[in-house]
Amino acid sequence: HAIKQAQAAGISDILISTDSSEILDTNHANSVRAIKRPDHLATDATPMIEVLTDLVAHHIPDDRLVVLLQPTSPLRRADHIRGAMDVYAHGTFDIVVSAVEMDRSILKAGLLVGNTFNPINKPEYVFSNRQSLPPVYKHNGAIYIFSRDWLHSNQSFDSDRIGLFEMSVAASLDIDNADDFARCEAEILKRDT
């Protein structure tokens, strides 16, 4: 799905980093290159940032826009990708990520240190009505956009200049387990009929 979504969004140079021999052996279109992921970066515990820093260092030689589309977000659409690219193009961001609005009551939460409740945000939010709290967004992992040189020099996604492209709850479903896969599959079948 990620390849088709990227192509539909107008992305002309697509790299796939994988350890799957099935994907590596597939005859991809000219604009798609499958690259063997080094074994030490092909574990379930490997952070995505390590895979990306290796990819930009060895396979993306010049500064260009990088759009990361994780395969675990199959309900993302081409218009989401184009929208996020537009946010990046018209902002002054180091990175743009897709996100979904979440329950505002998270602003009422805190950390327990000894017997002390330390609010995670402004103390007055703990005692505010939920509906009066500001909107809260959570990165959904569907889209990351950044320049190759920024990631190469930063070696991290950490930044104070993060742009946001909002996606719906339905489009933000992420596959983490078999139940998620079944829900995504049902949504795709419903959408395609």
Residues of each region from the PLM?
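Short, high-confidence coil segments that cap the C-terminus of an alpha-helix
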Residues: 11, 61-63, 90-94
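Short active-site oxyanion
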Residues: 10-15, 94, 170-171
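Short beta-strand scaffold positions
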Residues: 16-18, 145, 175
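Short phosphate-binding loop-to-helix
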Residues: 5-7, 15, 21-67, 75-79, ...
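Conserved core of the sugar-phosphate nucleotidyltransferase
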Residues: 50, 74-161, 166
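A structural signal for isolated positions on well-ordered beta-strands in alpha/beta enzyme cores
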Residues: 13-15, 67, 96, 163
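Catalytic donor-sugar/metal-binding loop of nucleotide-sugar-dependent glycosyltransferases
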Residues: 151-173, 178-193
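Short beta-strand/turn micro-motifs composed of small residues
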Residues: 18-19, 70, 99
